[in-house]
Design a protein with these regions (language model features):
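Aromatic-rich juxtamembrane segments at the membrane interface
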Residues: 115-236, 243-244, 434, 484, ...
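Residue-level signal for inorganic ion chemistry
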Residues: 47, 137, 151, 277, ...
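Membrane-interface helix/helix-cap signal primarily in integral membrane proteins
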Residues: 3-7, 19-182, 468-475, 481, ...
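Hydrophobic alpha-helical segments of membrane proteins
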Residues: 156, 308-321, 343-347, 372
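Hydrophobic alpha-helical segments of integral membrane proteins
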Residues: 133-148, 156, 164, 171, ...
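Non-globular, low-confidence helical/coil segments that flank catalytic cores
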Residues: 46, 75-94, 132, 201, ...
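Hydrophobic alpha-helical transmembrane segments in multi-pass membrane proteins
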Residues: 3-10, 16-20, 171-330, 389-428, ...
Length: 677
């Protein structure tokens, strides 16, 4: 025991061991190949229901058989209403590997599930219950969920008490944008509140501190079993370690208990370090412990202000690494909301759960909170976009904060680091052309060096991809506005998400094609007029610094595809040609009017349809690389085999195979990257 006490009280041993294990864990989880116990040929799966929910028009169930599986099943009232936690079900269907991100810097669903030890998704054709729940803990969970299912405020009871974030996507997004989402997940603040109630009760019945700590740990462990979450997992391990320290009088420092918490977390679940909730919870707790001496001297209001500012500062790298923007108003919101959540909302949630008569009162408070959050989240002036920082920069950031506890002058380095990250796009001398994977549609980015100009050609017609992948990518490389949105023509697959774009991202000017405005274009123009965004059509050229973009207009056609904006430009010695949906007829007219030879990069017309890319045209322009934006297994049969034959002398990149493609030029050297799904 003495030797153990000596090791635990050492200033460095625990820290060194934990850091070494952390590094080993990163290597192990990223380079070791974890294999599924299922075979892709399996079509029947038996498992216990551990979670289930409705998502749009389908039931999504998580089951535990040989390993965890996600089951997708078309919505069925009868089946959904019969489901309960702990039920054993038989699922028939086909296994498939979860989708990887096919656009740069987008959310990787495959990796997200991999870190949860889920390797397959089942597209179910049938689901049958073969045994009702027999697990005591699941029985309690079912009773608790049944109790609140008809309450107006059930989503907040699930979120604040059951570790089940059932809030609507819009509300969750607003909380995330405003930097207050941590207030709506069961974490240290919530657990401390529950423990304070428990200790108040225990003080009435016993004076033995050891018994209090043991009962407290039992409570947290049972809570974790019922409602597992990463941040609660950290709280549970930390609480147990504090109890062991107290009972055996080991006198371990708080900071070392936190390191031991990480060590045991990694041993129990090596993938815990990739959980965003755990990362945030751990880092904030780490710096709160470092600040504990200061906090002891503060009154309640000063503590709230200090903790809110500290939490904001230490969360900045996590936020910009994952969301690419920081909302500076989040500090004020946290100062305002922490007491409201801890003094009003959380106690009222517990009271409402016990006494449903207060449901309307809780619903009133939460509805007001949602309205405020949704309103504030739409205020763009408080948001600062940062490009995605490297892991090295993040490590330096946290080391500087640690050193600043000894010397406050180090905080100036934080300011310079953030300024450096912010200014990086203006110092980046690379030129980029990016073809986004938008399925059967078009969307391309042209990014000039040092952020001199950013141009988006078309938007595709998938709202999720626009909001969560295209706009997200723009932010991730530090683009804060689009100088031009070029609409090649009025078809939905090319401009279907233009309104979504201008409503969610700053656009300076919009350029339309020649000919009459189509339905989607007219709808967009109404929005542009309201937002006072300038728009043009029938342009001949754009001047970008010392470079020019040419619109190869020939005449107005009866076919809208032939009225597409065909764009030619060069950067240094590289030539680019974007064909929109122009047909063979337009191609011939272009060849008659313009001299286009030895094109470096051709955006193939009309998704590789047989109506475009004639052999004569391809032979004339002689492209080195060809880009085809096409949906996987699309109903049109794009790209056409004859077109592919015409392009056989070029290197072809396709979004259905290669995902997003980045054509990058720096120091007159070309580099091509793909994001294969």
């Amino acid at each position: 025991m003495r030797r153990l006490r000596y090791i635990l009280q050492s200033n460095y041993v625990i820290k060194i061991i934990t850091i070494l294990l952390f590094v080993i864990d990163i290597i192990y989880t990223n380079y070791h190949c974890f294999k599924s116990k299922y075979d892709e040929d399996n079509t029947e799966f038996i498992g216990i229901v551990t979670n289930y929910e409705l998502k749009e028009d389908k039931i999504v169930i998580e089951i535990k058989g040989y390993e965890k599986l996600i089951v997708n099943y078309k919505y069925n009232d009868e089946i959904f209403n019969k489901l309960s936690y702990g039920d054993k079900i038989l699922v028939k269907g086909k296994l498939y590997v979860p989708n990887k991100n096919s656009n740069f810097n987008a959310f990787n669903y495959q990796k997200y599930l991999y870190y949860k030890k889920i390797y397959y998704i089942v597209n179910a054709s049938s689901i049958d219950k073969i045994q009702n729940n027999k697990n005591y803990f699941y029985t309690i969970k079912n009773i608790l969920y049944k109790k609140i299912e008809n309450m107006k405020s059930s989503d907040y009871i699930k979120t604040l008490l059951f570790c089940d974030n059932s809030l609507s996507k819009d509300v969750k997004d607003s909380y995330r944008i405003n930097g207050i989402s941590h207030l709506f997940s069961v974490s240290g603040m919530h657990i401390n509140f529950f423990i304070s109630i428990l200790f108040w009760y225990l003080n009435k019945i016993t004076f033995n501190k050891r018994i209090k700590f043991i009962i407290n740990d039992i409570f947290i462990i049972l809570y974790l079993i019922l409602f597992p979450s990463a941040s609660l997992f950290r709280c549970a391990i930390m609480s147990i370690l504090f109890s062991i320290d107290f009972i055996f009088k080991l006198k371990i420092k708080k900071i070392d208990i936190l390191f031991l918490t990480l060590l045991f977390s990694i041993i129990i679940n090596p993938f815990i370090i990739y959980d965003l909730g755990y990362i945030y919870s751990y880092i904030v707790t780490f710096f709160l412990i470092l600040s504990s001496n200061k906090l002891k001297k503060m009154n309640r209001l000063s503590k709230i202000i200090y903790i809110s500012i500290l939490s904001f500062i230490v969360s900045i790298p996590i936020t910009i690494y994952n969301s690419y923007e920081v909302n500076i108003i989040s500090v004020l919101l946290n100062i305002f909301l922490v007491p409201i959540i801890s003094i009003i909302i959380l106690p009222l949630t517990i009271v409402t759960f016990i006494f449903p008569i207060f449901d309307n009162v809780l619903f009133l408070f939460t509805s007001l909170l949602e309205s405020i959050s949704l309103f504030i989240s739409k205020i763009d002036i408080t948001k600062i976009i940062f490009p995605k920082p490297s892991i090295i920069i993040i490590v330096i950031y946290y080391l500087v904060i640690i050193f600043s506890y000894r010397n406050r002058k180090y905080l100036l380095i934080i300011v310079f680091l953030l300024m450096g990250i912010y200014m990086y796009p203006y110092l980046n001398s690379s030129f980029k052309v990016v073809m986004f994977d938008v399925g059967e549609g078009d969307s391309y980015l042209i990014k000039y060096p040092n952020n001199k100009a950013n141009i988006l050609i078309d938007t595709g017609f998938n709202e999720y991809r626009m909001k969560n992948e295209i706009i997200s990518y723009l932010k991730s490389i530090g683009i804060r506005k689009l100088d031009y949105l070029i609409i090649t023509h009025g078809d939905e697959d090319h401009m279907g998400e233009a309104i979504t774009l201008v409503n969610n991202f700053k656009v300076d000017k919009v350029i339309f094609n020649i000919g009459e405005y189509q339905t989607h274009e007219k709808e967009l123009i109404e929005v542009l007029d309201k937002k006072k965004i300038k728009y043009y059509n029938n342009l001949k050229q754009l001047n970008i610094d010392k470079y020019k973009l040419y619109f190869l207009n020939t005449k107005i056609y009866d076919n809208e595809n032939d009225n597409s904006n065909v764009i030619y430009f060069n950067y240094k010695n590289f030539k680019f040609l974007f064909m929109g949906d122009a047909s063979v007829k337009r191609e011939m007219d272009i060849l008659d009017k313009y001299n286009l030879i030895n094109i470096d990069l051709l955006k193939v017309g009309h998704h590789g349809s047989k109506t475009s890319s004639s052999k004569k045209f391809i032979d004339e322009v002689n492209p080195k690389y060809s880009l085809i934006s096409v949906g996987k297994n699309n109903r049109y049969g794009h790209p056409n085999k004859e077109v592919l034959n015409n392009l056989e002398k070029t290197k072809i990149y396709r979004t259905d195979i290669d995902g997003s493609i980045m054509y990058k030029i720096k120091n007159n050297k070309l580099k091509i990257e793909t994001c294969a799904p």
